[in-house]
Structures are given as structure tokens and as C-alpha cells.
Amino acid sequence: MTRTATIVLLLAIATSAAPARAQTPAPLTVGSVTASAGEKVSGYIEVPAGVDSATRIPVTVVRGARAGPTLALIAGTHGYETQPIIALQRVRRALDPAALAGTVVLVHIANPPSYFGRTIYYSPVDGKNLNRVYPGRADGTVSERIAFAITREVIEKADYIVDLHAGDGNESLRPYAYWTPLGGDARVDSLQREMILAFGHDLIVVDTTRPKDLASSVYTTNTALLLGKPAITTENGYLGESAEPMIRRNVDGVFRLMRWLRMVPGAVPMPRRVTWLHRFEVLRSPETGTWHPLVERAQLVREGALLGYLTDVFGDGRTDIRASFAGEVLYVVATPPMSRGEPLAMIGAPR
């Protein structure tokens, strides 16, 4: 062997024996925010004016120093569901990009018009429910444009998505989550299920009725699922209050999920006993008037149990509302104003 060939061979051996360098994540841009590896950057997704006013969605991108999945956390889809919003502020402060594998995209308030307008369910600008207009429209009303922006800037750029909900300003709600398998991708359905357990939920509504057409996906997480991305909807909080146990529950759930995804170190103990609710019903008001609830969240009720009653604005004309099957009260509207067709309570049962 010639001296030159020997040198080439030794260099090849040395190169193959050297440890591979960890891949540095490329910068990620969400709206006006660009974060490079090891950075935490906050800013906005601008939603331009259209048929109505403009708005801007506050976001933070935490780009880990090491490669890993991209997890999107969305709070404030309904503006008065406040506990997840406060929780993501705490998550933002706690996240250290130097210790993170992957990226966390935090959508702090998905629905600023509703949050600052202090409205339940609907935007004060266009009267629409943001979680009923996905995947949105670039030329639609403000709620539709918000949904379009979140679909393009957040959902399409993420690997995993969590839509963090709570009881709205009028809803007294006990913690639960939704598992919504679409049946088209067993991998996604299974990962969605595991994400819920990793988050820490032990009471899970099983809903197999979600739309299967991406053009009319309706819901935030359903949009992600139809794009082949595991996504879950969690419910932790009630009545728009700054309830510390519910804020902590949201924060803890996020970090449990991040450990499960191996974005941060640590073990994830799964819930020991899980109840899957295959039967559920949202009872809706047959009339506009005043609601008098007689049950509380997490209360067990029998079939035919009196959940509350409606009267007119003078207190006359009582209409009783009863449970159509035995189960648990997942939430009950705890405030008097009631419009025809709006939710009164939700009941769930295993079968």
C-alpha cells in the first residue's frame, strides 16, 4: 500500500469513528416571530383587517437547543376560559430552551376579541364561535381569519397539538378530555389516546362523530387530526376564575406531556384508573329565560334526575330539565341568563 493510500485509509477510519454532531434545529418562524436554536421569542401572528377589524394573536416560540418534536399549545380559543391562558404564561416563564429538545409554540390567546371583550362562546365582533369555523377563511370574518391564521401558522407547523379549554365564564366544569378517533389513521388515533393519558386525564369523553372533511373540519383539534397530526382537547377550569388548582393542573399536564414526548427529562406516571365515557349528552335550553341549576359539577345523577329548571324573565312558567340517563355532570351552566339552544349541562356515562 502506498503512503498516500495509507493516509487516506486512516483518515476514513478516524472520520467514521468520530461521534456524529447533534443536528442543530433550523430557525422556526410563526407569524412575526422567528426563533433560532436555544432561543425563546415572543410576538404576534397578525390577522389583517377584512370585512371587519384586524387583530393580533400573542405567541411565543421556544426553540430548543436540541432537535425534537414541535408541540403547539393553544389557549384562549374561548376568551373567558382563563385558566389555560394563565397557565401558558407560567409555562413560558418556566421553559428553558437550553434544556429543551424540540420546540414549543405557545398560542397565549387564540381569540383576543373574545378575551378582551369578556365574552363567552362567541366573538363580540362577528358573533361566531372560533371553535366552530375551522379551518377558517382568509377572506372571512375575524373568527374565520383567526382560524385560518392558526391553521397555517401553528397547526401546519406542529407535530403535536393541544387545544387547552376550560369551563367558560358561565360553566362550572370538572376536568375531563376528549378522545376523538377518526378511524382513518390508527397511528394518529393511538397517539391521541396516549397524549390524553400522558397529560394526566382519567375521565375521557369518546366522540367518534367529528367531521372527516378537512374543508369543514369545524374544530381546532379536528383540523390537526385531518392533517395527520395527533391532537387533543383538554378541559381544566371553570367559571372564568383564576382558580389556582386548575391553573396548576394545566401547567402540570403540559410538562407531563413534554416528558412523554422526551422534550424534557423525567418519568410520566400514567393514571391508574381511567373512565371512558362512550355515552354523553349536552342538554340545551328549549327557551330563552332564566336558568336555575340544581346540580353541581362532578355530581352523579340518576336517570330522570332534576338538573334544574327554566323560568321566563318574570320568574313564571317553570320548565324542568331532567337527565335522560344516569351519569356524571361534566359541566353545568351556573349562571342565570339563558338563550334558546344554548347548553345547560353535559352528562357523561361509560355506556
Give each language-model segment a name.
Residues 2, 21-351:
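Structured catalytic-domain cores with a bias toward divalent-metal coordination
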Residues 5-16:
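Bacterial N-terminal signal peptides
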